[in-house]
Amino acid sequence: MEAVKKIGAAARCADIDLREVPGEATEEERAAFFQVISTQLSPEQIIRITQPQQTYPRQDYVLAVHWHPEQVPMELVDQRLDALYPHSQGELVIPTQHNVLLHRGDYSGVEVDCYSRGFNRKVQLLLHFKDIKMERAEVLLCMLKHTFKYRSSQLFEYLNTLVEPAFEDRLQLAAAQTNTDEDIVGFVRVQAQKLKDLLLENEEQVPDDAIKNKLVRNFFDALRQRYHDRVIDKAQVFLKAAKEIVKRHFSLDYFYRASEVIEEARSLGAGVVIPHPEQFWPILLADYDVDGIEVWNPQSQQYTEFLINVVNRRNRMGWHGKRPILIFMGDDCHLSEKLKAPSEQDPAKAIREVGLQPAWDDYAIRKSLIINGVNRKKVIEEYRSRLS
């Protein structure tokens, strides 16, 4: 008997009987688990990466200093870029994996989680290097390893929130915020416990890169063949609310301060860029030693023109001497989203592309950029010069 019953030809309603949801992971669920933690790409996934559905032959310069390869090998990234921008005349494309330094050609990059002590909140920084001397980078690499492990531990706090009675208040808050009924909450509890058990049972086989919050979303998506889409959709809405509550409670004490990260990175010749401007207004006020500010991001589009004018006004006033603040835009593309079947993709994330920042060609924004002499080609040349 099916645990989820489709009611009516159009399946407008979905009910779930928790008595018929197995308490232990089934073989099907075990297979789903190993599927979502796998870093091996199938032939279909390779095609999805190397043969993008849309290309941009009219874009002549490619600037991408905020994007995440995740488990996609760099040679496949290169093939995708060649297909996306067949007439590119110049590029600066640097990967910025979360808390892991990755290399592409002569350049390396990372997006670092840290915190701003003056404002007591988590922030992120983009670090970029050219020809980094790894033997000199031991301290930075240890800082990144520590941050990666601590940030990964949030997954277990997330799972514990979903299954442990001690965090019942968090679940009740998430349920109230999303109007989630008890059956869906119960379903999430059962499946989250299975996921936690599978993680602990197969600890030695789980790649480090898989230990992140999105594993929960991916695992539930992998259950769609067994459970009604409406049940999984409701579960995902509830899970997202619970995750945000976990993130708000996650201690900042074990992150490095932004100033410490910048100091160590600068000692190695790094360029530093502030991403996600609207999320991190305090960091813009802290006057950190940075090369640039991201004025546009798929998650941060509301104040682009304002930020462009702020940066240019500060530069004209000579606040930053001979190294004016550069204007960047971040595509914040996560390539793992491209690996999923189209029906399983998050549309808002799937539309992102490495090197694609439509704001450069927006007429209103472009007007501000032209007045201030800013374009992709100039930013590429200046930032490349600073990194060399």
Segments predicted by a language model, with ranges:
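Non-catalytic, alpha-helical, charged scaffold/linker segments
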Residues: 117-118, 132-214
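Charged catalytic cores and adjacent phosphate/nucleic-acid-binding surfaces used
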Residues: 2-91, 99-157, 225-259, 263-388
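Low-complexity, highly charged intrinsically disordered N-terminal segments
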Residues: 212, 216-231
